[in-house]
Swiss-Prot record:
Belongs to the complex I 24 kDa subunit family. CDD domains: TRX_Fd_NuoE. The subunit can be divided into two domains: an N-terminal four-helical bundle (residues 2 to 74) involved in interactions with subunits Nqo1 and Nqo3, and a thioredoxin-like C-terminal domain (residues 75 to 180) that coordinates the binuclear cluster N1a. It comes from Thermus thermophilus (strain ATCC 27634 / DSM 579 / HB8). It catalyses: a quinone + NADH + 5 H(+)(in) = a quinol + NAD(+) + 4 H(+)(out). One of its GO terms (cellular component) is plasma membrane. This is NADH-quinone oxidoreductase subunit 2. NDH-1 is composed of 15 different subunits, Nqo1 to Nqo15. The complex has a L-shaped structure, with the hydrophobic arm (subunits Nqo7, Nqo8 and Nqo10 to Nqo14) embedded in the membrane and the hydrophilic peripheral arm (subunits Nqo1 to Nqo6, Nqo9 and Nqo15) protruding into the bacterial cytoplasm. The hydrophilic domain contains all the redox centers. Binds 1 [2Fe-2S] cluster. This [2Fe-2S] cluster is referred to as N1a.
Length: 181
């Protein structure tokens, strides 16, 4: 059975947003649905999406592999994405990465034995003014991350708290600051 076999309403709603000849535009929402429900994108899901939108698995994989959001190996319940671009590096992201991987005992593509955590370095998360930044799953960013904030974040996640329930020491927030224009 395919992933989308029992999701016909979702498919109809998604495809209705695009002209019939533009079904390929639905690649992103279909990938996102798989990622949200399964936590990662299996090769057979790439093939299924390609069939549904009328393209090749190579094209679907090309779209999926462009974005760091999509995972191609199983991830932990909490997938920690550490920004690795210059602003975050200058603000201490490398030291946070080292602490994180040593503390959890895992590297990229690995999951902690309890299934809670996986880690990944990602390119710019777009919050250079609050560097260093970590994103947990698809949640708002954890900004101005220090070792103390990272320790509190890990403890809160281990305790089963939602991101917004975790008290982080120091100043900064859980989200990208919105600027009104």
């Amino acid at each position: 059975m395919g992933f989308f076999d029992d999701k016909q309403d979702f498919l109809e709603e998604t495809f209705a947003k695009y002209p019939p000849e533009g079904r390929r535009a639905a690649i992103m929402p279909l990938l996102r649905r798989v990622q949200q429900e399964e936590g990662w994108i299996r090769p057979e899901r790439i093939e299924e999406i390609a069939r549904l939108v009328g393209t090749t698995p190579t094209e679907v994989m090309g779209v999926a592999s462009f974005y760091s959001y999509y995972q191609f190996v199983p991830t932990g319940k909490y997938h920690l994405q550490v920004c690795a671009t210059l602003s975050c590096k200058l603000a201490g992201a490398e030291e946070l990465w080292d602490y994180l991987t040593e503390t959890l005992g895992i590297g990229p593509g690995e999951v902690t034995p309890d299934g809670l955590f996986s880690v990944q370095k990602v390119e710019c998360l777009g919050s250079c003014h609050t560097a260093p930044v970590i994103q947990v799953n698809d949640e708002p960013y954890v900004e101005c991350v220090t070792r103390a904030r990272l320790e509190a974040l890990l403890a809160g996640l281990r305790a089963g708290k939602r991101l917004e329930e975790i008290e982080l020491p120091g100043k900064c927030g859980h989200h990208v600051h919105e600027v009104e224009v």
